[in-house]
């Protein structure tokens, strides 16, 4: 009976997650004038992305002249701002095969202004870069962003005059060092008039456009984004965890420059189809649904800002996340403590009722928490080992060609890591105490050695391996009951939530929201049927697993695309949360051995899928790379 509930819940969770990751259908050329149309924008993409147009190239001059005409034709007051590129940028351009001398070591920004009814009000800027790397026509990066801005301007004009002025900033030399953005924000007369900026980027050729960066102190910005962005075709994909993580990464885009000046705003990008990044990125392979998604979000947010009574001001950072792309749920950071307290109280109700009627003990809850700790530690080790089968870590790539090939292998890496996490979940659900402890510990030690040899020294892998091996050598610590395993996992997740709430409250929702849902369902199930055998208790458990698991599946894909190249263990962390929902649906005792054998088969399949990436996406030979 439980196996049927488990299968149904997982199937529904996968369906919900996959549906939440879909891009909207591209609007056709005859869409309403006030709406964004990807097909209309594609005409600009096709003009821009005929060939690579890096700084200093003949095609760069062609694109620049054509964009000036387009901006003027849209009714914007258009000027060209020039400024020097840095020595470092010039050296980087040369290494990529470009010619900074042909550009006279100069970046040329295109600046267009659509005056508002009250030019004294702070203006809103739409920003994208029009240069490309020498080896790519850049249909996605960033012709899609430029074309989306042109179509957005057209639609805004069709909606009627706005109070605020709109500044269109098409920057140059972004690919070699953000030089164009530095030139504009470093001294253009308009820079101090701009109160909000929306930047459009791409690191791939498709997928949903994620809003992954804001100005600091973003509570008011997120409030506006939550109202305006959800009106966009396909809704929004964004959460404060992405903002928190990106803030601490070494990466930068043009948005970095105004952000560091204290300007509020939004940074949007799609990162699916990673094989197209700085590679073959022609108009015919660009995901038009991705263009519709990023453009529609740019339009709705820019229009809301232009017509707002006051622009968002920096306050505090908000804790927020989208729910299946359709609504933004947000709250102040301090509310996290209240959510944690409520979840602990509900877990207490579940534990008290299960202890009274099902014999649950504190020791069994502790064993359940150790089960979760073993899953997380083993997951970090095994996903890292499986990831290295697909190629070196990014820091050891050795060349640009190897790095871009690794990006192309991301789908294989993701599939391999996901299968690995699934195998571990099956092991926990089947009762990890059953396999020989020496075999389990030895397998984890071998995986750790593989990860360290192929991936390089990693303190995280070493620490996780020690924890996982130690817990494997003491199988008596594994949970023996469904209630012990379930409540222990909830307690572990809430403990992680408490630590995160203390150190990084913007990221704590990842633990607190699912933990609160799981605790509430556990309390309900304990009151309805402590034996966890009747549909009255199993139905809400399965429903929570489907909804909560579906949300986590939708979250896991952009997380892996963003950081999975170097941190594949992020899927193990998300897998722990899914495991928390499905743990009470563990199979009956008689199904343990086939369950564990199936887990081993899934683990082997995960390694094979990841390793196949080397065959499916080989590193191009140097001669082939030069010819490209």
What positions do the PLM features span?
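Positively charged n-region of N-terminal signal peptides that target proteins for export
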Residues: 1-4, 589
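Hydrophobic membrane-insertion alpha-helices, especially the h-region
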Residues: 5-19, 597-608
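C-terminal region of N-terminal signal peptides and the immediate post-cleavage residues
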Residues: 17-27, 610-619
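Peri-membrane helix termini and adjoining interfacial loops of integral membrane proteins
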Residues: 18-21, 313-318, 390-396
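Soluble extramembrane regions of membrane proteins in the secretory/endomembrane system
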Residues: 23-330
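C-terminal domain-closing interface element
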Residues: 192-211, 336-359
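Cytosolic-side membrane-insertion boundary helix
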Residues: 313-343, 361-364, 408-410
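Alpha-helical transmembrane segments of integral membrane proteins
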Residues: 346-628
């Amino acid at each position: 009976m439980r196996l049927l509930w488990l299968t149904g819940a997982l199937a529904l969770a996968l369906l919900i997650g996959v549906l939440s990751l879909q891009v909207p259908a591209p609007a056709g050329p005859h869409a309403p004038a006030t709406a964004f149309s990807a097909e209309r924008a594609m005409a600009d993409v096709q003009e821009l992305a005929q060939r690579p147009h890096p700084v200093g190239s003949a095609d760069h001059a062609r694109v620049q002249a054509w964009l000036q005409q387009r901006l003027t034709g849209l009714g914007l007051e258009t000027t060209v701002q020039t400024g020097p590129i840095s020595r470092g940028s010039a050296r980087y351009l040369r290494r990529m095969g470009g010619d900074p001398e042909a550009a006279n070591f100069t970046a040329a920004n295109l600046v267009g202004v659509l005056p508002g009814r009250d030019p004294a009000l702070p203006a809103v800027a739409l920003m994208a870069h029009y240069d490309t790397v020498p080896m790519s026509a850049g249909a996605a990066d960033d012709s899609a962003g430029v074309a989306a801005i042109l179509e957005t301007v057209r639609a805004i004009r069709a909606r009627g005059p706005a109070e605020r002025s709109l500044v269109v900033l098409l920057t140059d030399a972004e690919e070699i060092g953000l030089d164009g953005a530095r030139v504009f924000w470093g001294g253009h007369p308009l820079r101090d008039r701009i109160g909000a900026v929306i930047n459009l980027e791409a690191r791939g050729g498709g997928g949903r456009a994620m809003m992954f960066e804001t100005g600091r102190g973003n509570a008011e910005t997120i409030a506006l984004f939550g109202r305006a962005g959800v009106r966009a075709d396909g809704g929004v994909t964004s959460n404060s965890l992405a903002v928190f993580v990106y803030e601490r990464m070494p990466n930068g885009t043009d948005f970095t420059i105004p952000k560091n000046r204290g300007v509020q705003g939004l940074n949007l990008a799609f990162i699916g189809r990673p094989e197209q990044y700085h590679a073959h990125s022609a108009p015919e392979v660009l995901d038009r649904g991705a263009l519709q998604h990023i453009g529609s979000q740019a339009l709705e947010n820019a229009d809301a800002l232009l017509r707002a009574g006051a622009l968002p001001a920096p306050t505090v950072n908000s804790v927020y996340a989208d729910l299946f792309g359709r609504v933004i749920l947000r709250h102040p950071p301090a509310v996290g403590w209240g959510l944690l307290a409520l979840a602990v109280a509900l877990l207490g109700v579940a534990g008290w009722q299960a202890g009274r009627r099902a014999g649950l003990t504190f020791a069994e809850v502790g064993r359940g928490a150790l089960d979760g700790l073993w899953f997380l530690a083993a997951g970090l080790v095994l996903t890292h080992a499986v990831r290295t089968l697909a190629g070196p870590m990014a820091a050891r790539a050795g060349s640009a060609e190897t790095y871009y090939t690794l990006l192309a292998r991301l789908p294989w890496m993701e599939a391999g890591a996901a299968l690995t996490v699934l195998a571990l979940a099956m092991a926990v659900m089947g009762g990890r105490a059953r396999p020989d402890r020496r075999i389990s510990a030895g397998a984890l030690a071998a995986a750790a050695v593989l990860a360290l040899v192929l991936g390089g020294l990693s303190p995280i892998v070493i620490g996780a391996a020690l924890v996982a091996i130690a817990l494997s050598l003491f199988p008596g610590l594994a949970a023996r009951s469904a209630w012990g395993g379930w409540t222990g996992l909830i307690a572990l997740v809430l403990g992680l939530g408490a630590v995160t709430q203390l150190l990084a409250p913007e990221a704590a929702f990842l633990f607190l929201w699912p933990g609160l849902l799981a605790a509430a369902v556990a309390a309900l199930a304990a009151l309805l049927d402590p034996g966890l055998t009747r549909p009255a208790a199993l139905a809400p458990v399965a429903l929570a697993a489907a909804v909560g698991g579906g949300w986590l599946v939708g979250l896991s894909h952009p997380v892996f695309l963003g950081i999975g190249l170097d941190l594949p263990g992020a899927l193990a962390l998300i897998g722990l949360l899914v495991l928390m929902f499905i743990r009470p649906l563990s199979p009956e005792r008689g199904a343990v051995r086939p369950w564990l054998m199936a887990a081993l088969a899934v683990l082997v399949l995960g390694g094979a899928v990841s390793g196949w990436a080397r065959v499916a996406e080989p590193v191009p030979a140097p001669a082939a790379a030069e010819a490209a």
